[in-house]
Design a protein with these regions (language model features):
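A short alpha->loop->secondary-structure connector
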Residues: 101-108, 159-168, 210-215
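Short acidic-hydrophobic, aromatic-tinged amphipathic segments that line or gate anion-handling sites
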Residues: 108-114
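Phosphate-binding/switch region of NTP-binding enzymes
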Residues: 168-284
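The Walker A/P-loop phosphate-binding site
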Residues: 1-107, 119-128
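Catalytic P-loop NTPase motifs of RecA-like helicase/translocase cores
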Residues: 93, 151-152, 202-203
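Peripheral, non-AAA+ core regions of ATP-driven protein-machinery
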Residues: 18-24, 35, 164, 241-242, ...
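Phosphate-binding/switch loop-helix module in NTP-utilizing enzymes
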Residues: 114-190
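Terminal-proximal interaction/regulatory segments of ATP-powered molecular machines
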Residues: 289-334
Length: 334
């Protein structure tokens, strides 16, 4: 043990420790949806990891940007002194959109990036600047990249300007290099990174398979990869949001290949915190679904009525029971 301590002392690195001294507490950032918290962390009170990369992938119009902004809003609401750096590659985020989502404009920086090299450079500089601050002065911070699939490369731009009709074979390696540099630095700084990305159907696969674009760099760097699908949510004839199907394609924290449904409103309500808990309670046997109504305390109540007044039905005792069910359903080793 003395030898190991001498090695640690000789290296003189703040991030080199004897294993016994490592802080094993996993910290999470609440996403604003209990059921999404459960599928990515194994607890309805968890969320995305506070110092790892989380990838949110899906086809066009599955709500990746809306979903990311909903998580950002909840992060800023939960951390009144926190802030977020939003790397926008699609010029999709403007003041009107942010205001409609209820995001605090004073604590969000939108950074437009065109190339992988530009994102890598700006993100690394931001992390280094953050880590130069004394630990006690560091406020909670989150990074978002929306989206990886739209990033070009400097070579691709040069070839286009020179009218060269050639395919850029460097993009995959540049993505890998960017995440090799960022993954550990973000972990050391306790800064989470949410990356949105597009998916495509794998041609020739024996079973229908989807894969993320941009090569394997993000696939290896991300601790959690969530694939999204969606259907429209209507109030009468008006479309008021999406029902998002979220499936864990990869997770180092919770079980893989688990799927849940989340409700995302288009207005400033964002993610519905309680949507999906009725189905979770049904799995755990807390209540039964009989002809579209749930039996709770001897009464048969429609889901719409319960979700309209969640505090009445999701009491602290019920939430504790639901969390235990979530741990059994989604956590490793259960």
């Amino acid at each position: 043990m003395d030898f190991l301590k001498e090695i640690v002392k000789e290296i003189g690195d703040d991030f080199t420790k004897v294993a016994q001294d490592i802080d094993e507490t996993e910290r999470f950032i609440d996403t604003g949806s209990h059921i999404f918290n459960a599928v990515v962390s194994g607890s309805i009170y968890g969320g995305v990891s506070s110092n790892k990369i989380t990838a949110i992938a899906g086809e066009s119009s599955t709500g990746k940007t809306y979903f990311s902004l909903a998580v950002v809003k909840n992060f800023l609401d939960t951390n009144p002194d926190g802030y977020c750096l939003y790397f926008d590659t699609e010029a999709a985020v403007n003041r009107g959109l942010l205001e409609s989502r209820g995001v605090d404009l004073d604590r969000l920086v939108v950074i437009n990036v065109v190339t992988i090299e530009e994102f890598r450079s700006k993100a690394l500089r931001a992390v280094d600047k953050y880590m130069q601050m004394p630990i006690e002065d560091r406020k909670p911070c989150m990074f978002v990249l929306d989206s990886l699939g739209m990033l070009s490369t400097e070579k691709e731009i040069r070839d286009a300007l020179d009218d060269k009709q050639v395919r850029d074979m460097t993009k995959s390696q540049l993505v890998k290099g960017a995440f090799r540099m960022l993954t550990l630095k973000l972990g050391q700084a306790n800064v989470p990174l949410i990356v949105t990305n597009h998916t495509y159907d794998v041609i020739g696969a024996y079973v229908p398979t989807k894969e993320m674009g941009g090569g394997s760099g993000l696939k290896y760097a991300a601790s959690t990869i969530i694939y999204l699908g969606r259907k429209k949510e209507k109030d009468g004839k008006e479309v008021v949001g999406n029902i998002i199907k979220a499936k864990t394609a990869k997770s180092r924290i919770s079980k893989e290949n688990k799927q849940v449904e989340i409700r995302l409103f288009f207005d400033d309500r964002g993610l519905d915190r309680y949507y999906g808990l009725l189905e979770l309670g049904e799995i755990g046997g807390i209540w039964k679904n009989v002809a579209g109504r749930y039996e709770i305390n001897g009464k048969k109540i429609y889901a719409k009525q319960i979700l309209a007044n969640p505090e009445e039905y999701f009491t602290p005792e019920v939430m504790q029971a639901l969390d235990e069910i979530a741990q059994k359903e989604f956590s490793y080793g259960s």
